[in-house]
Amino acid sequence: MSDVLPIILSGGSGTRLWPLSRESYPKQFLPLVGEHSMLQATWLRSAPVAAHAPIVVANEEHRFMAAEQLQQLGVKPSAILLEPKGRNTAPAIAVAALEATRNGGDPLLLVLPSDHVIRDEAAFQAAVTVAAAAAEQGKLVTFGIKPTAPETGYGYIKAGVGTGATAVERFVEKPDLATAQGYLASGEYYWNSGMFLFRASRYLEELRKFQPAIADACQKAWEGGKRDADFTRLDKDAFASSPSDSIDYAVMEKTADAVVVPLDAGWNDVGSWSSLLDVSEQDGQGNAHHGDVIQLDCKNTYAYGSRLIAMVGLENVVVVETDDAVLVGHRDRIQEVKEVVSQIKSAGRSEATWHRKVYRPWGAYDSIDMGQRFQVKRITVKPGATLSLQMHHHRAEHWIVVSGTAEVTRGEEVLLLTENQSTYIPLGVTHRLKNPGKLPLELIEVQSGSYLGEDDIVRFEDTYGRT
């Protein structure tokens, strides 16, 4: 295979799949279809055609999740580029292209959103092979999905005559239903997948031609970025100065070298709970589920949850259960969950952004109970991991070890605690928690005080650069 370098775009917030997908843990990090997360599945399907480990473009807040999920697959990415603020796909791909050419190479960039489902991986890989041949000739390739219905939620691409990689005649905005029906009947149009393949230098060349402001801002953001062992943090001010634009508007609609390669591979962008039903294994009545679910005399329903969900006599209904929220909606209106999230945000509620269980680079914590002046958390610390040296102005903490071994720094003391042992951290005392063992550390934390927010943390030292 050609010199293909996957660029995985992982900056989305995924609120259309609330309450499972939230800003703090969006859908690309969830195993919605199969055992792997969508980010992991994106790499696994591209690996057979890749000559390099991927470059991942992610939000600062999601950096550890992206790194850890690739690490679970035994993959060390070529780079993880951190956007200080989302500026759409054209700038994200620009900084990835600059990174790809950093050491003098000029690979073919296979640009992939991290949150798509593709059922037929062999067909996808065959399409990449066709696209690579065109990209080697200087073309900018987009993958067009053969439409199966008159969808009004996708943009369309009109292709020229021919087979394989054919010239793009035009890009079309999301049409109304009648127009979409005409597109489907004509056989000349494809859904715009948001996946691309081109030489890194060709993309940068066309971007400089058509959107020099984006190219200049991204050059400065990349050159001024700060690198450590795992991440490259783009220069905040320079990247923020870039116009926010998609690759479609910035380059693909303007270049004379755009071609489209058809892709018929069971593609879905999983943009709603209804579309997740479409890509899930269904019973004879069109029902699908994930978890412990009973669907009695139901048709075309979808359920997702960890606790037992029982549905009786329902049609076209979606039920999603999490620890702190339940969504119930009609399949035809489930996309309106975005309005629900907006209302929750407006009310100042944490459920819009945070799960009850919050993942950190050192492990996770689950807020299992909360009341006036107290909160109870179940904390899990990975083997060898260390939390920051910190203190709190407004709360004291009690720690009880459930399993594993805890090394506790409390002021000038260092304690070693094992199962069924506990300690007390007074308000205002510096403290730190470490798991020195080879097994996960599990403990119960009881907080008490006048204010229990996560922003009442003063960090003095931190392994993960959060001071």
UniProtKB/Swiss-Prot annotation:
Pfam assignment, any one: ManC_GMP_beta-helix
Catalysed reactions, semicolon-separated: D-mannose 6-phosphate = D-fructose 6-phosphate; alpha-D-mannose 1-phosphate + GTP + H(+) = GDP-alpha-D-mannose + diphosphate
EC assignment: 5.3.1.8, 2.7.7.13
Name of the protein: Xanthan biosynthesis protein XanB
GO molecular function, one term: mannose-1-phosphate guanylyltransferase (GTP) activity
Keyword Transferase in annotation: yes
Metabolic or biological pathway: Nucleotide-sugar biosynthesis; GDP-alpha-D-mannose biosynthesis; GDP-alpha-D-mannose from alpha-D-mannose 1-phosphate (GTP route): step 1/1; Nucleotide-sugar biosynthesis; GDP-alpha-D-mannose biosynthesis; alpha-D-mannose 1-phosphate from D-fructose 6-phosphate: step 1/2
Protein family: Belongs to the mannose-6-phosphate isomerase type 2 family.
GO biological process terms held by the UniProt record: GDP-mannose biosynthetic process; lipopolysaccharide biosynthetic process
InterPro entries in UniProt: GMPP_N, Man1P_GuaTrfase/Man6P_Isoase, Man6P_isomerase-2_C, ManC/GMP-like_b-helix, Mannose-6P_isomerase_type2, NTP_transferase_dom, Nucleotide-diphossugar_trans, RmlC-like_jellyroll
Organism whose genome encodes this protein: Xanthomonas campestris pv. campestris (strain ATCC 33913 / DSM 3586 / NCPPB 528 / LMG 568 / P 25)
Keywords linked to the UniProt accession: Exopolysaccharide synthesis, GTP-binding, Isomerase, Lipopolysaccharide biosynthesis, Multifunctional enzyme, Nucleotide-binding, Nucleotidyltransferase, Transferase
UniProt KW rRNA-binding keyword: no
Domain of life according to the entry: Bacteria
